[in-house]
Swiss-Prot record:
General function of this protein: Catalyzes the transfer of an acyl group from acyl-phosphate (acyl-PO(4)) to glycerol-3-phosphate (G3P) to form lysophosphatidic acid (LPA). This enzyme utilizes acyl-phosphate as fatty acyl donor, but not acyl-CoA or acyl-ACP.
First-listed, main subcellular location of the protein, grouped into a coarse class: membrane
Family: Belongs to the PlsY family.
Annotated Gene Ontology cellular component terms: plasma membrane
Source organism (scientific name): Paraburkholderia xenovorans (strain LB400)
Protein name: Glycerol-3-phosphate acyltransferase
Amino acid sequence: MQNLIVAVVAYLIGSVSFAVIVSAAMGLDDPRSYGSGNPGATNVLRSGSKKAAILTLIGDAFKGWLPVWFVVHFGARYGLDDTSVAIAAVAVFLGHLYPAFFRFKGGKGVATAAGVLLAINPILGVATLLTWLIVAFFTRYSSLAALAAAVFAPIFDGFLFGPHIIALAIVVMSSLLVWRHRGNIAKLMRGQESRIGDRKKADAAAKPTAGSDV
């Protein structure tokens, strides 16, 4: 029963879409209506508002961090263990990808996954974030950086901690993140992928395409 409660609460926390909420609060267009069409920080940045993008990034990372951190640090007193941590991690991530509050149409989960990893272990989280930053800095492709981080996160975890149940959750999240970027992979191969900082087109009413997002 405890793990079911963990799953439901974590999923609902993950279902809060900061991209939509922040954009609405700041009088910006709905991020689902331009650019990649995905509610994430990278797409919000295409609105031209760095402040909104930063707030979205922080919010999405925080919601991933919160339930996992709580279970890691306070779970034992409620009979929770590493399995509960793994459940919280996957549930909050799924909440971001398929949010109940926004018709199950969410972002791609990079910032939320980063928050989850930081909660599991700060060293693991920082190593994965550095991977994203290095690739993003040299290529300016958010999607390519996300894919690199998704590949290396389970590797970093294996080197740091060896086999454990939480590693399975990390593999699941990484696999889902790569799956959510399948459109980006195709666009990268065609040389059509949007770069970080590209603004939305003047014809914002045009149908969104599958661009990068965090």
